[in-house]
């Protein structure tokens, strides 16, 4: 299975990793919490530096969502440490989350994070993993484009809301063009349920298959 990209809905592979915060076991060390694993091509590169600063600036928001951050690249621990020190010294931002030092590329190959035509650097990817260790979202970005932290936070909030309320989340939520901050109720599974839903005061509906509500 080496090199196969894990799929959404599968359990995150059990991995023992070296990080700037010591050894960790994934996903075990994050049981009971969500975590966002994000890989970056290399330390001491401009786009990756802007991403690390952006993640750190929003770290408290992730923690309020019971969500931890962990970075990853094919670099050694001392490279991560020197880069983090540079960010603190030159940019005034202290990186508080751990960064995986995958110097041999074993973790990256296991997660399918090395593109054959892009050399040996890790691709720019995001895994969102839930408290049970299940992969809930995977996002890839091109090497030349940095990630949007607002969207990653939105995805975590959306997944948590979907799990808690048993609903689906519309585009651009919570500022959807049709239903604003409402959420979508799963379609009715019978004619009777569809009729009841259209008559219910608990929902608003465009039609029996498109009903929504506030949460």
From Swiss-Prot:
Annotated substrate binding lies at 124
Which Gene Ontology CC terms are recorded? cytosol
- Using the UniProt record, name the top-level EC class of this enzyme in a single word: oxidoreductase
Major localization listed first in the record, in broad terms? cytoplasm
Q: Which reaction does it catalyse?
A: a hydroperoxide + [thioredoxin]-dithiol = an alcohol + [thioredoxin]-disulfide + H2O
GO MF annotation terms = thioredoxin peroxidase activity
Query: Which compartments is it annotated to reside in?
Result: Cytoplasm
**EC numbers on record:** 1.11.1.24
Residues in coiled coil: none
Location of the Thioredoxin domain: 6-161
- An example Gene Ontology biological process: cellular response to stress
**Keyword annotations for this protein?**
Antioxidant, Cytoplasm, Disulfide bond, Oxidoreductase, Peroxidase, Redox-active center
- In this protein, the active site sits at 48
> Which cysteines are cross-linked by disulfides?
205-211
Family, according to the entry, reads as follows: Belongs to the peroxiredoxin family. Prx6 subfamily.
Q: Assembly and partners? A: Homodecamer. Pentamer of dimers that assemble into a ring structure.
**NCBIfam families in the cross-refs:** PRK13189.1
Matching HAMAP family? Peroxiredoxin
Could you identify this protein by its name?
A: Peroxiredoxin
């Amino acid at each position: 299975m080496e090199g196969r990209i894990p799929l959404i809905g599968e359990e995150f592979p059990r991995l023992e990793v070296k990080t700037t915060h010591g050894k960790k076991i994934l996903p075990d060390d994050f049981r009971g919490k969500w975590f966002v694993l994000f890989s970056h091509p290399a330390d001491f590169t401009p786009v990756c530096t802007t991403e690390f600063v952006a993640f750190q600036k929003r770290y408290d928001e992730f923690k309020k969502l019971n969500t931890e951050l962990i970075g990853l690249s094919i670099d050694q621990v001392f490279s991560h440490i020197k880069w983090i020190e540079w960010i603190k010294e030159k940019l005034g931002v202290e990186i508080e989350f751990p960064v995986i030092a995958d110097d041999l590329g074993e973790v990256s190959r296991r997660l399918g994070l090395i593109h054959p035509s892009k050399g040996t650097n890790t691709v720019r990817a995001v895994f969102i993993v839930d408290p049970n260790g299940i992969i809930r979202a995977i996002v890839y970005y091109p090497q030349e484009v940095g990630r949007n932290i607002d969207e990653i936070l939105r995805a975590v909030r959306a997944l948590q809301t979907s799990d808690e309320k048993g609903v689906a989340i519309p585009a651009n939520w919570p500022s959807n063009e049709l239903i604003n901050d409402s959420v979508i109720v799963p379609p009715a599974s019978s004619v009777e349920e569809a009729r009841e839903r259209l008559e219910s005061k608990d929902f608003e509906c465009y039609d029996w298959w498109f009903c929504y509500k506030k949460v």
